[in-house]
């Protein structure tokens, strides 16, 4: 296809229907690659080793962070008994905030070609912080906060965005498969880390040796990632200005509704993740069973993350799935008030894990839907994740304060249920704004990229007009992590 044809297509494309799996065809220079876009390796030793390294980083970074519920339980009952549950939750909240919130800065550094600096720097900081955590003494809150909250959180945050972004340098047609493998690392980590931590710090090894064992595992895996991951493209000659993207955000009401909704939703979303195991333990359930509540929830979350990709093949609207998943989480959090038996905890863990995993899987697609200029996608995702991180930072301490030292469980459950319900209203408002914007967009300007790389884009434009009119929100390729194309 000629350059002039590409320019015409870019000028007439509707921003919300751009297929992310094929967007690179339209703007190959955006990544600083001077070679034709059809020269993506789509495999090979270097590509799959990089995917393996990214999988490992997700396992060690976000997979570890989402296992904080084990520490919340252990610190509250045994190791930090002089601190309230609200104070203790600041450790996990700050850790999560840094993992997600640092992306707005780390992403810019990655765009400028500092991948290896970020990879080695984040790995060293994470390893050092976890070994320092093993030296923390009982009832010394500041030692644990500095090592686990700040150190490990910042180290994981430095690794998180680059481990996802690097995969796009090797894959286009098989990017969905590659990204699915990478994203499953965090789910596997959220499943296995609680098992290991409960068996070690609550077992014969104790806190110090158990933490060292976990730190040794993570350090060894991160070293493997550093040795096998490689970049393919040179640093780009031009990086889009962050200020221009932010100015566009201020005028985008749909994105504002989404960002505010994410901030509010995150305040309540992490309540079950941080407190479910402590809830099960303090209600007199068998300790061995209580240790598995997080494992059950995270195993179900893995299934929930795969579900949107399956439903999208049946043209289920992305926006509808997003609102339903947030609403499902809200209803289930209210349900925490009544769970008191083993069976109730199992049922809650399975259903909440499913909806929570589904919500996380849809974050990327819904943010892509809200991005008019594909070159601003990274900046907009950074802003949205920063809002999410702020909500996660506030949620743990607020819920801990409502819980009080007397463990009054209905208070944080009601509060978290209310805020997630309010967030769902914001997400519905976002969909209404998108719908109104669709109605004011001339149908002649709507375009999606070719569904298969072998068909001309012009033919796809003619054949997909009727599909776009029937389904305004289902967008082929907006689920790059879970949409399998071989």
Language-model segments: what does each one mean?
Residues 101-142:
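Conserved MFS/SLC helix-loop-helix module at the cytosolic interface between two early adjacent transmembrane helices
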Residues 68, 75, 149, 156-171, ...:
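Intracellular juxtamembrane helix-capping segments at the cytosolic ends
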Residues 117-131, 319-335:
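Structural signature of the two symmetry-related core transmembrane helices
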Residues 1-44, 432-486:
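Intrinsically disordered, low-complexity terminal tails of fungal membrane proteins
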Residues 101-115, 304-318, 403-404:
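Helix-to-loop junctions at the C-terminal end of transmembrane segments
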Residues 55, 59, 129-130, 141-158, ...:
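Hydrophobic core of transmembrane alpha-helices in multi-pass small-molecule transporters
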Residues 173-177, 181-233:
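Helix-loop-helix hairpin linking two adjacent transmembrane segments in secondary transporters
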């Amino acid at each position: 296809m000629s350059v002039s044809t590409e320019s015409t297509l870019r000028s007439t494309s509707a921003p919300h229907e751009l297929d992310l799996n094929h967007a690179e065809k339209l703007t190959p220079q955006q990544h600083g690659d001077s070679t034709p876009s059809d020269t993506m390796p789509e495999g090979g030793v270097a590509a799959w080793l990089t995917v393996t390294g990214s999988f490992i980083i997700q396992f060690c970074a976000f997979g570890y962070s989402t296992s904080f519920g084990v520490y919340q339980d252990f610190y509250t009952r045994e190791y930090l008994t002089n601190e309230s549950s609200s104070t203790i939750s600041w450790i996990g909240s700050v850790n999560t905030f840094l993992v997600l919130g640092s992306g707005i800065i780390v992403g810019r550094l990655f765009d400028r070609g500092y991948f290896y600096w970020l990879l080695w720097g984040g790995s060293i900081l994470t390893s050092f912080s976890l070994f320092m955590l093993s030296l923390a003494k009982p009832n010394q809150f500041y030692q644990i906060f500095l090592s686990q909250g700040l150190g490990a959180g910042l180290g994981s945050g430095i690794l998180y965005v680059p481990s996802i972004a690097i995969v796009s340098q090797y894959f286009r047609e098989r990017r969905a498969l590659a990204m699915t493998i990478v994203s499953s690392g965090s789910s596997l980590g959220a499943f296995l880390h609680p098992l290991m931590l409960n068996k070690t710090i609550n077992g014969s090894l104790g806190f110090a040796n158990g933490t060292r064992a976990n730190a040794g595992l993570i350090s060894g895996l991160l070293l493997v990632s550093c040795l096998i991951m490689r970049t393919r493209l040179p640093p780009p000659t031009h990086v889009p200005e962050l200020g221009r993207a932010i100015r566009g955000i201020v005028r985008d009401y749909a994105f504002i509704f989404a960002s505010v909704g994410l901030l509010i939703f995150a305040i309540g979303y992490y309540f079950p993740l941080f407190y479910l195991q402590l809830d099960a333990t303090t209600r007199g359930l068998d300790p061995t069973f209580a240790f598995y509540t997080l494992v059950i929830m995270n195993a179900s979350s893995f299934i929930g993350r795969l579900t949107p990709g399956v439903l999208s093949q049946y043209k289920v609207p992305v926006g509808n799935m997003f609102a339903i998943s947030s609403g499902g989480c809200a209803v289930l959090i209210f349900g925490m008030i009544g769970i008191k038996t083993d069976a109730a905890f199992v049922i809650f863990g399975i259903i909440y894990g499913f909806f929570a995993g589904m919500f996380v899987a849809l974050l990327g697609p819904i943010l892509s839907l809200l991005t008019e200029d594909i070159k601003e996608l990274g900046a907009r995702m950074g802003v949205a994740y920063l809002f999410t991180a702020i909500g996660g930072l506030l949620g743990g301490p607020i819920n801990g304060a409502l819980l009080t030292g007397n463990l009054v469980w209905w208070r944080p459950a009601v509060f978290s249920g209310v805020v997630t319900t309010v967030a769902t209203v914001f997400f519905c408002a976002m969909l209404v704004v998108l719908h109104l914007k669709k109605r004011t967009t001339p149908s002649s300007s709507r375009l999606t990229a070719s569904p298969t790389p072998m068909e001309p884009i012009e033919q796809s434009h003619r054949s997909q007009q009727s599909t776009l009119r029937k389904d305004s929100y289902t967008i082929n390729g907006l689920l790059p992590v879970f949409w399998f194309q071989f």
